[in-house]
């Protein structure tokens, strides 16, 4: 599984960071999934390998502008490029009203249907052939969710010794079993794929968090999770000065939580625009990493715009070169 950061700034963009957006795919950009769509997201996409024509679904964590203001432009551009495939939009109900109002009041139209799915439904679940997605309620000034992406339909390995022992000769039936299909033989026997195949590895799981001041809400979902992507808007000293109203997390909060549940990989994002990236800048963004490392002993990453990460089948996370 791979994911690319399209924006890592909180609230407003900076010269080096756009507002929130994340592209995620299982094994290549056809199809892919977008989590949040801040202003300028479609511009960021033009510097990556992801195309709006192959976009399968958009997942919106909450209604704040730095997470949704890029939607009208992205959707109408896809239409102008000739998209016809339906697009799922998983989001709070207000997002549908926002999109429809923007399109209605700008003499715009779409060449493809939008399928709106309420992210706040108590029984929310979404899936396609590649991933299954659940979500977790977070703590923010408005309703907010984290999305949990779990790999589906893992490749199967034939139990050849059992097939041979049961007198099942190699042939098309073996291929069907390996694809997860049950097979009815000419002699009337029903072969169940689960009996003659095994899945030799663990399904990969990634949590993509929205804005949240209580990382502990993700405790249950973190069990069996291999990567947590979570906001770290401030260092703790700044969070203390700002006070509780913004309802964001500090690097210290997230790191302590990740350590407590033994998450193997933590990727921090959504940094306040006050943090500078240039050498000598102050306060510097590296202060967030330094604070987190005091409390977290796993693999820590500080996201940058256009950074691409790959979670391998052996569950190791690697940061690749900038996807530009």
Stretches with model-predicted labels:
Residues 178-306:
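Cap/insert and terminal regions of metallo-dependent hydrolase folds
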Residues 14-16, 129-208, 212-220, 227-229:
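Active-site-proximal loop/helix segment associated with metal-binding centers of metalloenzymes
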């Amino acid at each position: 599984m791979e994911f690319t950061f399209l924006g890592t700034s909180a609230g407003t963009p900076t010269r080096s960071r756009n507002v929130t957006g994340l592209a995620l795919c299982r094994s290549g950009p056809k199809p892919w999934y977008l989590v949040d769509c801040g202003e300028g997201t479609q511009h960021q996409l033009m510097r990556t390998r992801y195309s709006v024509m192959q976009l399968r679904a958009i997942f919106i964590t909450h209604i704040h502008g730095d997470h949704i203001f890029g939607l009208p432009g992205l959707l109408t551009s896809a239409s102008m490029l000739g998209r016809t495939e339906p697009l799922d939009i998983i989001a709070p109900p207000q997002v549908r009203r926002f999109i429809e109002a923007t399109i209605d009041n700008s003499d715009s139209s779409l060449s493809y249907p939008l399928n709106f799915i309420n992210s706040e439904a108590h029984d929310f679940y979404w899936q396609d052939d590649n991933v299954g997605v659940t979500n977790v309620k977070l703590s923010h000034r408005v309703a907010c969710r984290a999305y949990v992406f779990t790999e589906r339909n893992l490749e199967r390995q034939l139990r050849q010794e059992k097939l041979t022992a049961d007198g099942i000769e190699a042939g098309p039936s073996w291929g069907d079993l390996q694809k997860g299909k049950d097979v009815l033989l000419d002699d009337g026997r029903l072969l169940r794929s689960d009996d003659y195949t095994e899945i030799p590895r663990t399904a990969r799981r990634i949590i993509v968090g929205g804005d949240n001041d209580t990382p502990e809400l993700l405790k249950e979902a973190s069990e069996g999770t291999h990567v947590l992507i979570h906001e770290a808007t401030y260092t703790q000293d700044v969070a203390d000065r700002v006070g509780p109203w913004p309802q964001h997390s500090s690097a210290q909060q997230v790191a302590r939580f990740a350590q407590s549940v033994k998450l193997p990989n933590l990727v921090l994002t959504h940094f306040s625009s006050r943090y500078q990236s240039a050498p000598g800048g102050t306060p510097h963004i590296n202060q967030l990493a330094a604070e987190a490392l005091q409390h977290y002993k796993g693999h820590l990453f500080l996201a940058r715009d256009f950074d691409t990460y790959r979670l391998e089948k052996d569950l190791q996370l690697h940061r690749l070169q900038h996807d530009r």
